[in-house]
Each structure stands twice: as structure tokens, then as C-alpha cells.
């Protein structure tokens, strides 16, 4: 919660979209400050490696990830922290996960098959012991659409415009991704074939990755 100390000792953490500590206004580095005031010095080594997560929900799915240029930039089959780091290194720190109307079946298949793809297995307000619930996820996505974190469109042209990415670039990226899905092998980034879900049937969605 001390931005000045973060700038000095953990500058990478400043790339995150939001910084949240619980309880709020704690973790201010008071003990470090008192030690330095008493003559101590911070250990001279590399900067603290901040752990940055993705926000749960529509932005954590393991579908096609594109940057602000409409280009794929990573193997989406990684943990949420790796996704955050890759996303933050993209132009303007912007990235989206793009998928189609089959998303609920695809995500449930990933959860039931223990495939992950970086998504969060649990759901907010999920009763202990209950499985992943499609209706809860639909409600979560609806809220994300309302909040502007997810955009939806009937065509890829319209989706690209709502995302603010080059239309032709996004369409070319989706075409290439669908080719890899049909082939069953990710020649570009090595993603597992089980997670290569094609993007073919509208409406189409894009969830903003938030770290």
C-alpha cells in the first residue's frame, strides 16, 4: 500500500491495472522504514518479483488472447500469473481473450477435464462442494458486459471495433487460430490441442484481461 516504496523496490508491480491489499491500508512497509531510520539498509539484490493475478471471470479463460494490435502473443495454456506478466508487456498493457457462443460448453469441458488453461476453477459465491455452475458463470459474464469488461458482437468486424483493435488484423488472427484448432496442433505457441477451441459461431465475445 506504499506506492513510493513500490516504485523503489518493486517497480514491476506498478504495471498492474489495480492494487488491492486486505485489510486495506495495511502492508505499508512501516517496519522497513523504521529499520532504515535506525541505520539499516535494504538488501541489494534484484527487485521484488511481484505476484500479479488476473481478475477472475471472463478475462481468465484460456481462449485466444490478442493484444491491442489484434495479434496473438502467447500460449494461453499457462497459469494466471504468467498471463498477467505477458499481458503487461504488450503495447499499452492491453490484452483480450476472444471466444464465441460455445464458450459455456468450452469452459465447462476445461473445468471438468482438469485442463485449466489459466482459468479460475472456483466461482464467487459457489457453495462448498458444489461443482462449476454454468448459470453462475453466465450471470458473471452478464455483469462483466454491463461493467464494460466484456464486449459482445454478432460479427468479428463489429467485435474488433468495440475492442479498439485493427479489424483485418483480428480477423486474420482468428482465421489462423481456427486453422490450428482444425489441425489439432498449435504450430505457433504450443498450446495443448484440448484447449484449441475454434471461434466460429456468433455472437462473439472479448473479455479484457485485468491484472
Features from the language model and the residues they span:
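An anion/pyrophosphate-binding glycine-rich loop and adjacent beta-alpha core
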Residues: 32, 41-159
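A glycine-rich dinucleotide-binding beta-alpha-beta segment and adjacent secondary-structure elements
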Residues: 169-211
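Short Gly/Pro-enriched turn/cap motifs at secondary-structure boundaries
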Residues: 22-24, 52-56, 87-88, 196, ...
Amino acid at each position: 500500500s506504499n506506492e513510493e516504496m513500490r516504485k523503489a523496490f518493486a517497480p514491476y508491480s506498478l504495471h498492474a491495472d489495480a492494487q488491492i491489499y486486505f485489510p486495506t491500508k495495511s502492508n505499508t512497509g512501516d517496519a522497513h522504514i523504521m529499520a532504515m531510520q535506525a541505520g539499516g539498509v535494504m538488501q541489494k539484490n534484484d527487485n521484488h518479483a511481484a505476484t500479479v493475478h488476473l481478475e477472475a471471470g471472463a478475462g481468465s479463460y484460456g481462449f485466444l488472447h490478442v493484444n491491442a494490435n489484434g495479434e496473438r502473443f502467447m500460449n494461453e495454456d499457462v497459469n494466471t500469473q504468467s498471463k498477467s506478466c505477458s499481458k503487461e508487456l504488450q503495447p499499452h498493457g492491453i490484452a483480450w481473450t476472444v471466444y464465441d457462443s460455445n464458450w459455456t460448453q468450452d469452459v465447462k469441458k476445461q473445468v471438468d477435464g482438469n485442463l485449466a488453461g489459466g482459468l479460475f476453477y472456483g466461482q464467487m459465491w459457489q457453495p462448498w462442494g458444489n461443482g462449476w455452475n454454468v448459470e453462475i458463470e453466465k450471470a458473471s459474464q452478464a455483469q462483466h458486459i454491463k461493467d464494460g469488461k466484456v464486449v459482445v458482437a454478432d460479427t468479428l468486424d463489429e467485435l474488433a471495433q468495440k475492442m479498439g483493435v485493427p479489424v483485418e488484423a483480428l480477423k486474420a488472427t482468428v482465421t489462423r487460430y481456427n486453422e490450428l484448432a482444425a489441425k489439432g496442433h498449435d504450430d505457433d505457441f504450443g498450446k495443448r490441442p484440448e484447449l484449441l477451441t475454434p471461434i466460429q459461431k456468433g455472437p462473439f465475445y472479448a473479455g479484457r484481461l485485468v491484472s
